[in-house]
Amino acid sequence: MSKRESSKYKIDRRMGENIWGRPKSPVNRREYGPGQHGQRRKGKLSDFGVQLRAKQKLKGYYGDLREKQFRAIFAEADRRKGDTSENLIGLLESRLDAIVYRAKFVPTVFAARQFVNHGHVTVNGVRVNIGSYRCKAGDVIEVREKSKQLVIVLEAVSLAERDVPDYIEVDHNKMVATFGRVPTLSDVPFPVVMEPHLVVEFYSR
């Protein structure tokens, strides 16, 4: 297991939830956290604890984003007009690595970031190697020709555990996706309940 794969499953164990809906998640086999004290019964969380957990879960879901990076995304969401929690989800789902993951070009969001960083993807015909690159509605994301037959890509397309959401149009024969629109929370196919309003409360303390 790679260091990044281990980190991914550590997030699942820490949250006590299979946050990506993966069949191999260790929480499918046990309902306690990592480490020797993981089986201890957890006490009721304080309001702060509930808010912190919601933030950690959302931050972890998008590839265990660094706190500084996640806070900057939140700050932009807060500056925008409208509901901050909806803005936050929209910004996270507009990331290039998130779209590559949603389009089922790769099996995990961690793989999506690495896939983009290694230059396997173009946006509107231009190679982009920054996972946090923000896509706009109408942008066309394509796997580069030399990368379309990579095993990781071929395996991801056939994954039955998740579907492509309706705000992304995908042609898996050509390995091309169009980001149709910025989604709202209710549009996003999270396998577990995400509570971005609690993230807003956390940063508004």
UniProtKB/Swiss-Prot annotation:
Keywords on record: Ribonucleoprotein, Ribosomal protein, RNA-binding, rRNA-binding
Domain S4 RNA-binding: 94-157
Region feature Disordered, mapped onto this chain: 1-46
Transmembrane segments: none
GO process annotations (BP): ribosomal small subunit biogenesis; translation
MF terms (GO), sorted A to Z: rRNA binding; structural constituent of ribosome
UniProt xrefs under Pfam families: Ribosomal_S4 (PF00163), S4 (PF01479)
CDD domains for the chain: S4
Any one GO cellular component localisation term in the record: small ribosomal subunit
Compositional bias per record (Basic and acidic residues), positions renumbered to this chain: 1-16
Keyword Hydrolase tagged: no
ATP-binding recorded as keyword: no
Described purpose of this protein according to its UniProt entry: One of the primary rRNA binding proteins, it binds directly to 16S rRNA where it nucleates assembly of the body of the 30S subunit. With S5 and S12 plays an important role in translational accuracy.
Family per similarity comment: Belongs to the universal ribosomal protein uS4 family.
Subunit structure: Part of the 30S ribosomal subunit. Contacts protein S5. The interaction surface between S4 and S5 is involved in control of translational fidelity.
HAMAP family assigned: Ribosomal_uS4_B (MF_01306_B)
Protein name: Small ribosomal subunit protein uS4
Organism field: Rhizobium leguminosarum bv. trifolii (strain WSM2304)
Gene name of the encoded protein: rpsD
